[in-house]
């Protein structure tokens, strides 16, 4: 069945909500880092990800916790310690990330060639 222009976006693209959750700005690097390196404190995540501001990282971590993709653990010590780790639900994305990594390794050179050809044409 061909989607009509009156169909809601979720029907027109059923993976749209997943793309919004998993591939929004900074979310993918956070999930990738927690998957690859395990439980981490805020500063460790910030260091690994790079240019993300503390405010934005905090917002993304809260959103991912709300979505059930990460777990935040508060340790009532002096000084207080907070750690983040990927949840079972977040871990279920591992095959998707592996597939995307494989696709990138194989196809990004072709994307670079296409971009260069496009730029040469001056389009």
Language-model segments: residues:
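A short, conserved structural fragment
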Residues: 65-75
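Alpha-helical linker/hinge and terminal dimerization helices associated
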Residues: 32, 67, 96-111
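Generic detection of well-ordered alpha-helical segments
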Residues: 24, 28, 36, 91, ...
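Basic, amphipathic "hinge/linker" alpha-helix immediately C-terminal to the N-terminal HTH DNA-binding motif
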Residues: 76-99
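HhH-family (HhH-GPD) DNA N-glycosylase catalytic core used in base-excision repair
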Residues: 1-9, 19, 106-123
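N-terminal helix-turn-helix DNA-binding core of bacterial DNA-binding proteins
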Residues: 9-56, 67, 83
């Amino acid at each position: 069945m061909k989607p009509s222009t009156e169909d809601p976006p979720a029907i027109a693209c059923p993976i749209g909500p997943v793309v919004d959750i998993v591939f929004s700005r900074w979310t993918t690097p956070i999930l990738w880092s927690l998957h690859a390196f395990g439980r981490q404190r805020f500063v460790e995540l910030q260091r690994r990800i790079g240019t993300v501001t503390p405010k934005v990282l905090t917002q993304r971590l809260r959103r991912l916790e709300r979505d059930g993709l990460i777990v935040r653990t508060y340790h009532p010590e002096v000084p207080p310690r907070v750690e983040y780790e990927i949840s079972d639900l977040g871990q279920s994305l591992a095959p998707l990330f592996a597939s995307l990594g494989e696709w990138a390794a194989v196809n990004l050179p072709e994307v670079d060639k296409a971009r260069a050809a496009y730029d040469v044409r001056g389009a």
